[in-house]
A protein has these predicted regions:
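ATP-binding N-terminal substructure of ATP-dependent carboxylate-amine bond-forming enzymes
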Residues: 1-50, 212, 261-272, 280-303
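An exposure/low-complexity boundary signal
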Residues: 2-19, 182-195, 242-270
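Active-site nucleotide/adenylate-binding loops and adjacent lid/helix of ATP-dependent enzymes
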Residues: 27-158, 297
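Short acidic loop-to-beta-strand element that houses the catalytic metal-binding Asp/Glu
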Residues: 66, 171-175
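Short beta-strand element of the conserved SAM-dependent methyltransferase core
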Residues: 70, 102, 127-131, 174, ...
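ATP-dependent carboxylate/phosphate-activation module, predominantly the ATP-grasp catalytic core
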Residues: 107-110, 115-164, 176-223
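Active-site-adjacent "lid" and substrate-binding segments of diverse enzymatic cores
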Residues: 166-169
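Peripheral (often C-terminal) accessory segments that flank ATP-dependent C-N-forming ligase machineries
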Residues: 204-303
Length: 303
């Protein structure tokens, strides 16, 4: 499949989309890392800090001030694995971990941004904000219809300085308009909320290094997340019941976000919980209601 999707619950967004031979579109950081040797340095979070002039260092080097934010230097699995706030020098002495780094604890709005890029120049932006819970979890994400001009200006300039020669989708994670992570792929969790024809335009971008998406029918959407407890072996819910829910116009898609044939510990999940499902929708209250219903279905179907 030329659109490389490793999570089977997201292939629904790419089925039936024609992709020319020889064109490979990553939706996964590991695949993107292999595809783009010239630009894969962006997965080194030390360099993300360095290119922005942010104080940073390896574990073993003492920060000049606390608190700091600690995380793995490389993490191609995502989900905030291994990340934490370190409050003091005393705590730092106990928390040092090989392969980890620290950076400033940045405060502000947390935004996930997808940009369509042609030769290092952004041609299209879409921003998503998350309602955070604890320990790396999010309650839901709002896919915004409106722009974020300051993020677009800051990240656009960063792209021009650092990703000349790259054409494709870039995903930024920012807090307070500072880049905390960057990925050479799209946010495949909510591409159905970007509008009809968007995936086809992405294929055209990778095939022709050109962007032509009209984007004249934007609407705000929501990606609502269901978490369960760690260490539980969950079964899948009745697919026929899920199909009935998908017939509702306010619901765009539902993802069951785990491998039933894998042990819970074999999944990359945030410290706070095990992600079971995602409801993408056009109406937040409807999405929250479906999440509650799914939760009841999961508790009723233990493995």
């Amino acid at each position: 499949m030329p659109i490389v999707e490793r999570d089977p619950w997201r292939t629904q967004y790419f089925e039936g989309v024609a992709c020319p031979d020889g064109v490979t579109i990553p939706t996964d950081d590991a695949e993107a890392y292999l595809l783009y040797p010239t630009h894969r340095w962006i997965y080194n979070k030390l360099l993300i800090c360095e290119t922005q002039g942010l104080e940073h260092g390896l574990h073993g080097l003492m920060p000049s001030r606390f608190p700091v934010f600690s995380k793995p230097i490389f993490n191609l699995k995502g989900m905030g694995a291994g990340s934490k706030v370190i409050e003091s020098p005393k705590a730092y002495e106990h928390e040092q971990t090989p392969g980890h780094m620290w950076m400033p604890l940045i405060v502000g709005e947390h935004v996930s941004t997808d940009a369509a890029v042609v030769d290092g120049e952004a041609k299209w932006w879409r921003h998503t904000i998350g309602k955070a819970l604890s320990d790396g979890m999010f309650d839901y994400w709002t896919v915004l219809a409106e722009p974020r001009p300051q993020i677009e200006a800051y990240c656009g300039e960063w792209l021009r300085r650092n990703l000349k020669g790259y054409s494709g989708i870039v995903n930024f994670e920012t807090i307070g308009e500072t880049i905390i992570e960057c990925h050479l792929r799209m946010s495949d969790q909510w591409v159905d909320l970007y509008g009809p024809g968007w995936v086809e335009s992405v294929v055209h971008l990778y095939a022709n290094k050109d962007w032509g998406y009209a984007d004249d029918s934007r609407r705000t959407g929501y990606s609502v997340v269901l978490f369960g407890k760690h260490g539980v072996r969950y079964g899948q819910v009745d697919r026929s019941m899920v199909a009935e829910v998908l017939s509702r116009p306010e619901i765009s898609s539902i993802q069951m976000t785990f491998h039933e044939d894998k042990l819970p510990d074999a999944h990359s999940m945030p410290p706070g919980g095990f992600r079971l499902a995602i409801v993408n929708c056009w109406d937040l209250e409807a999405g929250l209601a479906i999440r509650e219903w799914l939760g009841l279905m999961f508790w009723a179907t233990p493995k």
